[in-house]
């Protein structure tokens, strides 16, 4: 079966994900970060485009990090104003978070709301295929095939990551169950030993009192 170009384009739109959000960020003197999380494979390009309108007495900070065991912090940018474009490359497969805080620096009411637009492109979505097409003289179909190849590779890597995580969780559950079994056996042995000791102690006590032979 041969897929036509419209079918390829439709399939590509199903596979690719768009992480564009707009939300309100409330200022505070000790603000809590508001994070947007997305999965990214190892060595993936992540481009974050933030549109932060300038407001007086407010400082918006952006931090890009991941949720791995190492807790890698890829970038921290202070006092973002206007449109900012940030690019990082991930070290390992994990959820990547873009965290924003809105710190109030004035002397009045700190509870001021600022609207923020955030666009996160990961992997194939972050690659400039127009530049590649111009550089390598690729046709539209060849460009779409490149996109599909990159997206398919990302899906395979994500499935592998989920499988490895499931195996780690299963190993953890099996280890926990084994420890519970050992602990239960120890409790039973201690209970039996304590019962035997009490019987011997009572027998010795009754003998001293001449209650039994």
UniProtKB/Swiss-Prot annotation:
> What are the alphabetically sorted keywords of the record?
Endoplasmic reticulum, ER-Golgi transport, Golgi apparatus, Membrane, Protein transport, Signal, Transmembrane, Transmembrane helix, Transport
- GO CC annotations on file: COPII-coated ER to Golgi transport vesicle; endoplasmic reticulum; endoplasmic reticulum membrane; endoplasmic reticulum-Golgi intermediate compartment; Golgi apparatus; Golgi membrane
Highest rank taxon of the organism: Eukaryota
Cytoplasmic topology: which positions?
203-213
Give the signal peptide as a residue range, or say none if absent: 1-20
**Pfam families per the UniProt record, alphabetical:** EMP24_GP25L
Transmembrane segments annotated in the record for this chain: 182-202
Question: Which residue stretches are annotated as topological domain Lumenal?
Answer: 21-181
Q: Where in the cell is it found?
A: Endoplasmic reticulum membrane; Golgi apparatus membrane
Q: Where is the GOLD domain?
A: 33-122
What membrane topology does the annotation report for this chain? Answer: Single-pass type I membrane protein
Principal subcellular localization: endoplasmic reticulum
One GO biological process term is: Golgi organization
> To which protein family does this belong?
Belongs to the EMP24/GP25L family.
Summarizing the function annotation, the protein's role is: Constituent of COPII-coated endoplasmic reticulum-derived transport vesicles. Required for efficient transport of a subset of secretory proteins to the Golgi. Facilitates retrograde transport from the Golgi to the endoplasmic reticulum.
Q: What's the protein name?
A: Endoplasmic reticulum vesicle protein 25
Whose protein is this, by species?
Answer: Cryptococcus neoformans var. neoformans serotype D (strain JEC21 / ATCC MYA-565) (Filobasidiella neoformans)
